[in-house]
Amino acid sequence: MGKSSEAWCIVLFSVFASFSAEPTMHGEILSPNYPQAYPNEMEKTWDIEVPEGFGVRLYFTHLDMELSENCEYDSVQIISGGVEEGRLCGQRTSKNANSPIVEEFQIPYNKLQVIFRSDFSNEERFTGFAAYYAAIDVNECTDFTDVPCSHFCNNFIGGYFCSCPPEYFLHDDMRNCGVNCSGNVFTALIGEISSPNYPNPYPENSRCEYQILLEEGFQVVVTIQREDFDVEPADSQGNCQDSLLFAAKNRQFGPFCGNGFPGPLTIETHSNTLDIVFQTDLTEQKKGWKLRYHGDPIPCPKEITANSVWAPEKAKYVFKDVVKISCVDGFEAVEGNVGSTFFYSTCQSNGQWSNSRLRCQPVDCGIPEPIQNGKVDDPENTLFGSVIHYSCEEPYYYMEHAEHGGEYRCAANGSWVNDELGIELPKCVPVCGVPTEPFRIQQRIFGGFPAKIQSFPWQVFFEFPRAGGALIGEHWVLTAAHVVEGNSDPSMYVGSTSVRMENLANVQKLTTDRVIIHPGWKPGDDLSTRTNFDNDIALVRLKDPVKMGPTVSPICLPGTSSEYEPSEGDLGLISGWGRTERRNIVIQLRGAKLPVTSLEKCRQVKEENPKARADDYVFTSNMICAGEKGVDSCQGDSGGAFALPVPNVRDPKFYVAGLVSWGKKCGTYGIYTKVKNYKDWILQTMQENSVPSQD
């Protein structure tokens, strides 16, 4: 029967209702006014809920509603989880004579909605429906399209639980199983690691973490055969679903996936620790992977310093290797203030050498030592191979053994070395016998001509008693024995023409260290009565060295050849501050030239001393007679040098042939100690007493 359009104009009432209740195990749902006719234009909803873990069985025992296509007019609708499970209208009867149920629904969820709707008019009287619901057990393991458990599903009334095979564990979501494959630490220097169950399929939904931890100084090296790797391949975007990853400190290798290992077959990690992470998802498990690893000693660079030699020599040095590093000649390793020609170094766990701060650097010989009376050129540097030159203060000093030269080279042992002298420093010795100004005036000293000290730079002035001496070295004065007899500390000066006190204050005063009289000298006689002046010679050793210059320089000692034997007629020089024919006291230095004559001339001189007889005087081969009438030395000149020219020398140079000793009468012939006869004694005495006292 069709619907009248006029019926839309009469609206009796419209009811919308919704009912819900706490979860129950069963219940009844009846259409409004059941079993009477249900009202028009009404909508009513029942929210059915049974306890968790149960489904709902909904069945109708009576259904009498207006029939329409697709139940468009009146209907009862069943909805679960937003999905329509059914829509009913019309009349239904039981298909089973033994059961009153005309329609039945089993919902695997614990909630559903029942919605009753009626339109604005019914041309017949319809009584509606009667329905009942009850909680039913649901088999979650089989009743759902989505499997609730990754492995084993176990159903029970009101619920289910998941379980796992042996060696698996249940994740926190209580549904998925994984493998206990983390926490393994490998410390052996060689080993093998594989995925769980290899070569059988690895577990799904797992994260396996392994760690290789080797002793510091070794790096982990991993090797994999391509055929030993089969992991679920990457997706279309290139992302690995299952993956193998290596992480070593700040380096990462991977992730890797696919059939056949896609990475390098040998991985050098440069680290003693390696983390291995294997991660899988829920789909497509393959056979997995197998790898081998070993510890390779960390290498150290072959050269840590130039100019060195290593022992032992090897192509490669690795952790714990020890080498002796020897610097090549001329180089040394310096630490602090200490230098060494070698040191030891150990390859450390970090791939660095111990003692790497040390370097083989050129040996530094340091600032050259100064020398007395000389100087050394300032070198550009003082390192190995550098050359320096020593020189003496010319013209007053010369270099002893000059044939060896003054060149020194910085040697490998850190010393300045001369080719001939080795490490011995050159010695600057005074130039002897060379006056700054030649004495040109031929004049007798007795009442003679004034002279400059530059003409007799070897002249020594003895203050008391007034006498003379000859400087023969930096530490030695030669004089007559009778001058220093009884006087162990004579006062002496050098370098002054005048012996006024104000002049002496500005020149070098010599300090006596020791007086050594010739052992053949006969001591004790009074000079006024002495007639034996044999061996009248003495040495005075000085405490401090004499500084040579234009007014001070030594006279040479005689040589040993016959050329140094004074002969009659040889002209020699004498100087001093002795008495003249006019003055007993002389202030300015005077000098003269005297010829050598025979001892007989001296014997024939008439004796003026009333206390001595002429026949008592002793004449020996240790004496020289020199002078001529009116030209002689006198009191105050004793001990001074009688200087003869050095034979066979172009430039003027003098040696001490004699020392003023004695004479019978001033202004005539005088006796001089013959120095040549005492040459050996002089040298031996100087050698045996070569180190002056420093007191």
From Swiss-Prot:
Its EC number is 3.4.21.-. The modification (3R)-3-hydroxyasparagine is found at N155. Disulfide bonds join C71-C89, C141-C153, C149-C162, C164-C177, C181-C208, C240-C257, C300-C347, C327-C360, C365-C410, C392-C428, C602-C625, C634-C666. The active site is at H482, D536, S638. It is found in: Secreted, Extracellular space, Extracellular matrix. It comes from the Eukaryota. The iron and 2-oxoglutarate dependent 3-hydroxylation of aspartate and asparagine is (R) stereospecific within EGF domains. InterPro entries: CUB_dom (IPR000859), EGF-like_Ca-bd_dom (IPR001881), EGF_Ca-bd_CS (IPR018097), Pept_S1A_C1r/C1S/mannan-bd (IPR024175), Peptidase_S1_PA (IPR009003), Peptidase_S1_PA_chymotrypsin (IPR043504), Peptidase_S1A (IPR001314), Sperma_CUB_dom_sf (IPR035914). The keyword Transcription regulation does not apply. SMART domains: CCP (SM00032), CUB (SM00042), EGF_CA (SM00179), Tryp_SPc (SM00020). This is Calcium-dependent serine proteinase. The lineage of its organism: Eukaryota, Metazoa, Chordata, Craniata, Vertebrata.
